[in-house]
Each structure stands twice: as structure tokens, then as C-alpha cells.
């Protein structure tokens, strides 16, 4: 597990909104999105999941996420019957945790990220947070990066 701080440029993504318990809606959404990309023969370069609600504050059946693909610049998209939309992820300062998630313990990784952010003199910004998947999870483990927009804490240098 390693933490770094990175200034990232804006990034275009093609995403699909899913609603429901994250452990169920995100994998289901990715199945649909990947099937759509294969039908369209789209050469994606990254897979991401954006989380919009805090599970400790929002009912499980109302949790919102976007599953997303990054496509090479200039990729033409054919018929869009799935409702995939193009969005731009804002750039800025991010805390980035590179880790391996075992036994589906994604929440543990997020908690570790927030602890490390505070220990390094930063706080989560009211921006964006997402997971970038660096493998397909077929081994039962997920190599991921968790990106959280951050601001310096007052008094931090």
C-alpha cells in the first residue's frame, strides 16, 4: 500500500449510472458497460468507478455510482442504446492510494486512505473520488488506485 499526491489533468470518460448497494450495482454496471463496449468494438484504456454517496449516510438502495471507461482520444462511438454518457472528470490535487483489496474489503481500503490523508496534512475536498482498476479481479484480489480530491488542512504547508 502506497500513498502519493498527484496533480491530475481533466479526463474524459464514458460512464453509466448505477443505483443500489455498491457491492451489487457496480459489478452489474460493469458487466453491462463492458458488453456494450465489446459490441461497439471500443478500445478502452482504463476502467473507473465513481462514488457519489457515503454508505454511512445514504440508504443502500439509493447509493449512486458511475462505472466508466476511458477511451483513446478521438474514438468514435456508434449507437448508444445503453444510456452511456460522456463526462469530464475535473483535474486537480488528488491523494492516490495504490493497494491490493482482498476478500472484497474495499471499505477497509477507503478507510485507510482517509486516515493517511489526515496524517499527511490534507483533508478530502468536496470534489470527486473514484477507484481505478489495475486488474480484472479474477484472482479474487483487486489491484486498485483510489483517487480522492484533497485540499491542504488549515495550517498545513
Swiss-Prot record:
InterPro entries: AraC_E-bd, DNA_gyrase_inhibitor, DNA_gyrase_inhibitor_GyrI, GyrI-like, Reg_factor_effector_dom_sf. It holds the Pfam family GyrI-like. It comes from the Bacteria. Keywords: Cytoplasm, Stress response. It is found in: Cytoplasm. One of its GO terms (cellular component) is cytoplasm. Its main location: cytoplasm. GO terms for molecular function: DNA topoisomerase type II (double strand cut, ATP-hydrolyzing) inhibitor activity. The keyword Transmembrane helix does not apply. SUPFAM superfamilies: Probable bacterial effector-binding domain (SSF55136). Inhibits the supercoiling activity of DNA gyrase. Acts by inhibiting DNA gyrase at an early step, prior to (or at the step of) binding of DNA by the gyrase. It protects cells against toxins that target DNA gyrase, by inhibiting activity of these toxins and reducing the formation of lethal double-strand breaks in the cell. Interacts with DNA gyrase. Belongs to the DNA gyrase inhibitor family. This is DNA gyrase inhibitor 2. The lineage of its organism: Bacteria, Pseudomonadati, Pseudomonadota, Gammaproteobacteria, Enterobacterales. The gene is sbmC2.
Amino acid at each position: 500500500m502506497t500513498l502519493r499526491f498527484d496533480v491530475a489533468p481533466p479526463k474524459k470518460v464514458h460512464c453509466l449510472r448505477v443505483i443500489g448497494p455498491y457491492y451489487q450495482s457496480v459489478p452489474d454496471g460493469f458487466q453491462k458497460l463492458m458488453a456494450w463496449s465489446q459490441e461497439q468494438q471500443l478500445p478502452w484504456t482504463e476502467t473507473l468507478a465513481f462514488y457519489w454517496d457515503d454508505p454511512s449516510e445514504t440508504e443502500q438502495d439509493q447509493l449512486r455510482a458511475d462505472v466508466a471507461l476511458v477511451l483513446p482520444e478521438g474514438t468514435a462511438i456508434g449507437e448508444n442504446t445503453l444510456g452511456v454518457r460522456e463526462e469530464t472528470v475535473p483535474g486537480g490535487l488528488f491523494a492516490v492510494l495504490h493497494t491490493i483489496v482482498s476478500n472484497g474489503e474495499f471499505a477497509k481500503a477507503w478507510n485507510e486512505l482517509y486516515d493517511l490523508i489526515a496524517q499527511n496534512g490534507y483533508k478530502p475536498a468536496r470534489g470527486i473520488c473514484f477507484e481505478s482498476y489495475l486488474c480484472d479481479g479474477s484472482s479474487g484480489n483487486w489491484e486498485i488506485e483510489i483517487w480522492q480530491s484533497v485540499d491542504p488542512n488549515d495550517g498545513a504547508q
